Amino acid sequence: MFLLYEYDIFWAFLIISSVIPILAFLISGLLSPIRKGPEKLSSYESGIEPMGDAWLQFRIRYYMFALVFVVFDVETVFLYPWAMSFDVLGVSVFIEALIFVLILIVGLVYAWRKGALEWS
């Protein structure tokens, strides 16, 4: 029989982990001083007055490099635990990791062919 009372701890942690950040934002919003002045409204650039406009438009090339970096950085995060427990896991996990790496290599080749890795 399916018993819902076994999930009481889960619901308690869910409620507590939701309430704590909300309370932190509310309390900091209530206790923080609200003063608007020219220093508060100016943009900050290494402790000196900004040179030029603070809003610069970046080329899409930067975003493409960042996106490719994030994809392969996440790949490393997923492959590290697998590499640390490689001797304990079986052949099926090795095949799954191999398929995962092959899918990422296909994505890298696709990005390379589309010119996402060229800086010109």
Swiss-Prot record:
Reaction catalyzed: a plastoquinone + NADH + (n+1) H(+)(in) = a plastoquinol + NAD(+) + n H(+)(out); a plastoquinone + NADPH + (n+1) H(+)(in) = a plastoquinol + NADP(+) + n H(+)(out)
InterPro entries linked: NAD(P)H_OxRDtase_bac/plastid, NADH_UbQ/plastoQ_OxRdtase_su3, NDAH_ubi_oxred_su3_sf
A single Gene Ontology CC term: NADH dehydrogenase complex
A biological process from GO: photosynthesis, light reaction
Membrane-spanning parts: 9-29, 64-84, 88-108
A GO molecular function held by the record: quinone binding
Enzyme Commission number(s): 7.1.1.-
Pfam families (alphabetical): Oxidored_q4
Membrane topology: Multi-pass membrane protein
Keywords: Chloroplast, Membrane, NAD, NADP, Plastid, Plastoquinone, Quinone, Thylakoid, Translocase, Transmembrane, Transmembrane helix, Transport
Top-level taxon: Eukaryota
EC class (word): translocase
Subcellular location: Plastid, Chloroplast thylakoid membrane
Keyword Protease among UniProt keywords: no
Family: Belongs to the complex I subunit 3 family.
Assembly and binders: NDH is composed of at least 16 different subunits, 5 of which are encoded in the nucleus.
Biological role: NDH shuttles electrons from NAD(P)H:plastoquinone, via FMN and iron-sulfur (Fe-S) centers, to quinones in the photosynthetic chain and possibly in a chloroplast respiratory chain. The immediate electron acceptor for the enzyme in this species is believed to be plastoquinone. Couples the redox reaction to proton translocation, and thus conserves the redox energy in a proton gradient.
Protein name: NAD(P)H-quinone oxidoreductase subunit 3, chloroplastic
Gene transcribed to yield this protein: ndhC
